[in-house]
Design a protein with these regions (language model features):
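Hydrophobic, lipid-facing positions within transmembrane beta-strands of outer-membrane proteins
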Residues: 54, 68-72, 82-86, 118-122, ...
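Short strand-turn segments of transmembrane beta-barrel domains in outer membranes
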Residues: 26, 43, 55, 60-90, ...
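Surface-exposed beta-strand-turn/loop segments characteristic
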Residues: 24, 97-116, 121
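Outer-envelope beta-barrel architecture signal
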Residues: 66-70, 82-84, 93-97, 118, ...
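Residue-level signature of outer-membrane beta-barrel architecture
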Residues: 90-92, 126, 171-175
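Membrane-embedded beta-strand positions of outer-membrane beta-barrel proteins
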Residues: 70-74, 99-101, 124, 136-138, ...
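Flexible, glycine/serine/threonine-rich loop segments and coil->beta-strand junctions
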Residues: 7-9, 13-32, 40-55, 64-67, ...
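Flexible loop and strand-edge segments within Gram-negative outer membrane beta-barrel domains
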Residues: 106-113, 117, 131-181, 186-212
Length: 217
């Protein structure tokens, strides 16, 4: 996953969130992360046209040897905050797979500040040889969030219900002096957003937005 910085905006390479112009961090599964690389300055040659200001490259873990690995983590804190995540990785010969799921929630430190999120990710890969490999993945996240507004002038019913999904398929080759890839991707989303209103005010319009984005690379 690569985040390209364009001025003050930030977009995932090949995974645009066109409604708000930025990626949804809640969609990432942290247990898959091996390391995070931060590149300053233009990097469009390697990471696409959105990497004009720099790149945040999230490198996912890879199984180097045959076997099965399963990890789980859970955390609980203030304001009834719960964070859970589980992952399973398999490698057998040329085949590899990754499946993860997460659930997070909190009541928030104020009334009408609840947040709840479900997320899942799956990836299948096949290595034809040392130079060529094929892989496909899918990532889905759904969350509900409430915004209470300013403490002295709170919002009522300023709620969002958002579902975002992404799937991609890629054929890659890596040689000593060259590398290449042919990739296809599809993004979709559904957003139910209530702008809310202040006490004594008028209810605003409920927006129901569906979008998708198809591309190749």
């Amino acid at each position: 996953i690569s985040l390209g910085l364009v001025g003050s905006e930030m977009c995932i390479r090949d995974r645009y969130m066109g409604l708000m112009g930025h990626p949804i961090a809640d969609a990432y599964q942290t247990m898959l992360t091996d390391r995070v690389e931060v590149l300053r300055g233009p990097a469009s040659v390697l990471y696409g046209s959105n990497a004009m200001g720099g790149v945040i490259n999230i490198v996912t873990r890879k199984m180097q040897e045959d076997g099965v690995k399963t990890h789980a983590q859970i955390g609980y804190g203030s304001y009834n905050t719960l964070q859970t995540e589980v992952s399973n990785r398999i490698r057998k010969g040329s085949f590899s797979s990754v499946v993860t799921g997460s659930y997070n929630r909190t009541d928030g430190h104020r009334d009408n500040m609840e947040f709840e999120q479900y997320g899942g990710y799956a990836k299948l890969g096949y290595d034809f040889n040392d130079s060529w490999k094929l892989w496909g993945d899918v990532n889905i996240t759904q969350f509900k969030a409430s915004n209470p507004g300013e403490a002295g002038n709170p919002y009522i019913d300023n709620d969002s219900r958002i579902t975002r999904g992404m799937t991609s398929l890629a054929l890659e080759n890596h040689y000593e002096k060259s590398s290449g890839a042919l990739s296809f991707f599809y993004n979709w989303g559904r957003h139910k957003i209530n702008d809310g209103y202040h006490p004594g005010g008028t209810c605003r319009e409920l927006r129901n937005i569906e979008l998708c984005h198809i591309g190749t690379g």
